[in-house]
């Protein structure tokens, strides 16, 4: 879902053009043909929350949300704040957190991944409302080694989603899976792209990751070899009870 955005050719924008962050009397700049909704406005906060609420009412079996946000704030002006434009960035973020707090309170058992043009919102305040975040849209496994190594200096493995994708097909599925297994393992790849052997390996790898899940998610991390010091990298995870590594 991407409830913070609005398309100019939409019923929402036609009814509430003043709900968008948009500078008056200037040419409007559209990023990805979108505008950002003004979350400093309590009515907009109610609307954004209602997006989640309506989805859950219509689809109570929903088991996972990816909360996306792919546009920076452009056309900087809040119709709601009027002569308090200096508060826009602060009040906008507070408004987002107000929405997320309501979502978390009402749907505490639904896992939610935070994505914002990749990893633009990876911070501990946002993590209060999400179970995990998307470190980067770059899923090349070689480059992900460095990305995940860096993120792991500040965040635990359980907070970072890492997926096997079709990026860099020159690398094996095993290598891509090994890299993604450093964090919360997932697969964003068409099964038809995999050979029978690759599919069988992937199923085994998922089962093995689940076997070690407690050690990876909640154990202690040991940095054995830095990717910045040679042509390979190694991490070790040990469970709190030291029974798994």
Regions found by a protein language model. Give the residues of each.
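Phosphate/diphosphate-binding loops
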Residues: 1-3, 44
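Short, solvent-exposed beta-strand-terminating loops
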Residues: 6-9
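Active-site neighborhood of glycoside hydrolase catalytic domains
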Residues: 11-174, 178-200, 206
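Short, Gly/Pro- and small/polar-rich lid/capping loops
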Residues: 104, 222-226, 236
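Conserved structural scaffold segments of CAZyme catalytic domains across common CAZy folds
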Residues: 201, 216, 242-243
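Glycine-rich, Lys/Arg-enriched anion-binding loops that position phosphate/diphosphate groups
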Residues: 205-231
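Carbohydrate-binding surface patches
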Residues: 228-245
């Amino acid at each position: 879902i991407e409830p913070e955005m609005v398309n100019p050719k939409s019923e929402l924008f036609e009814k509430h053009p003043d709900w968008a962050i948009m500078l008056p009397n200037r040419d409007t700049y559209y990023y990805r043909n979108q505008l950002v909704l003004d979350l400093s406005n309590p009515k907009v906060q109610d609307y954004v929350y209602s997006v989640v609420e309506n989805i859950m009412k219509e689809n109570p079996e929903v088991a996972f949300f990816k909360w996306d946000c792919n546009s920076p704030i452009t056309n900087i002006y809040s119709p709601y704040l009027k002569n308090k434009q200096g508060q826009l960035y602060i009040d906008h973020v507070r408004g987002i957190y107000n929405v997320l707090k309501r979502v978390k309170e009402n749907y505490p058992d639904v896992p939610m991944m935070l994505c914002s043009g990749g990893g633009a919102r990876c911070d501990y305040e946002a993590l209060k409302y999400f179970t995990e975040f998307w470190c980067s849209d770059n899923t090349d496994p070689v480059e992900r080694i460095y990305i995940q190594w860096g993120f792991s200096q500040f965040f635990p493995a359980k907070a970072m989603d890492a997926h096997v994708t079709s990026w860099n097909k020159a690398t094996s599925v095993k290598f891509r899976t090994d890299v993604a297994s450093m964090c919360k393992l997932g697969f964003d790849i068409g099964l038809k792209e995999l050979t029978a052997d690759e599919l069988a390996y992937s199923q085994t790898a998922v089962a093995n990751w689940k076997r070690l899940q407690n050690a990876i998610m909640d154990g202690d991390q040991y940095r054995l070899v830095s990717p910045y010091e040679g042509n390979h990298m190694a991490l070790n995870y040990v469970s709190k009870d030291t029974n798994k590594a």
